[in-house]
Structure formats: structure tokens, C-alpha cells
């Protein structure tokens, strides 16, 4: 796929999302007393099973898997993971089997993302932990890879950190470059960008892009899992 991004031009991508997504002003919120102008990056319009910013990462991650000749990919996250749902959708589109190791008991209600995972054809299995940093997770991934290997499937693993983290952050560098073009087109220079921070990849990628492009815009991540003293070094490492 060819896009306008220059900072990651040497990395392979496969088209999965509808980009660029719009940057829209929120007129009523911006009109509130004491409020500066507020703009919203419409990642809800990215396509691919309402995947938000996940298709951006998957364009790079699935391209890497395809370059290796992968017939299957495996990833792991919470039972209602948006990333897992988007990965299942990407696999369905590209004809690649998707194995999901979801944290939980297996007794979770079949609704939301879990239902969509199954409708999209993913191989859903559960692992007995709720902690994304559980040291047993790599072993469970290895077990699933071994199972797929016995079935004759060449398998690629999507799991932080390592190459998955590097490519995921690179995808968000592209987002930062896309936003910089939109700032220029709108004639604005935002003081800060606020976003949720889970893995830290989006914060890392945006901050790296803005710094590289010489933008003064701060990137403020609101952690959804861990405290700041855990997240900050993680984000720095992934940048």
C-alpha cells in the first residue's frame, strides 16, 4: 500500500483501514466558557470492524506476517479486547487464520467483542489469568504455536514487546504525521493531544512523530491500566 507518510516509508503495509480519518472541531465544547478550541481525531471512522486505531497497527503487523508466509497469527489480550476483534477482522479479510488467547475463565458471556471474534472466524481459547504481564503468557503462546505447527500452519505471533511493539509504534508515527498535515491544513497548532494509554504504543508513536517533525504539541496519555511510574518508562522504551 502507498500512502503519503514519509517517516515510515521503508516499512511494508497492507491496506486495511480508511485513512486519513477526519480531524473535526467540537463546536459546542469549544464554545464553553474558559475552553480552548477542541478538535477530535475521528478514529471511529477507520473502518475494519469498528477497529478505531487498531487497523493502523495491523496494516504493518499483518504485512510483516504475510512477508514471512504466515498462514496464521496468534495474539493475546483481555476477553473483550478491541485489538483482538480487529485482528480477527484483518485475518478474515486477508485469509489468514487468527488464534486468540483471551484472559479469562471461558465462562464469559458471549457478547460484544467476544461474540464478534467468533463470528469473524477466530480460534478463541482462554488462559487462566487477568494480568497482561503474567509471566506464564509466553508459555501459553508457545503451546498454541506448537499446536498450529502440528496442523501444518506457519504461524506468526503478535505480542509485545519486540517487533510487534516496534511496528505498532511505527503505525502511530504515521498517525502523528497524518495529524501534522491536518494541523497545517486547518491552520492550527494544538498545545496538547489527549488519548487513552493501554500498551503505550500510540503515545510513543505520536510523541516520536511530533518531536521528529518539530511540533511543540504535547502528548498526554491517560493510563487505563497501570500507574504513571510504570507507564512512562514503558512508553519511552517503545518510542
Task: Label each PLM-derived region with a short phrase.
Residues 1-239:
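PLP-dependent amino-acid enzyme catalytic core
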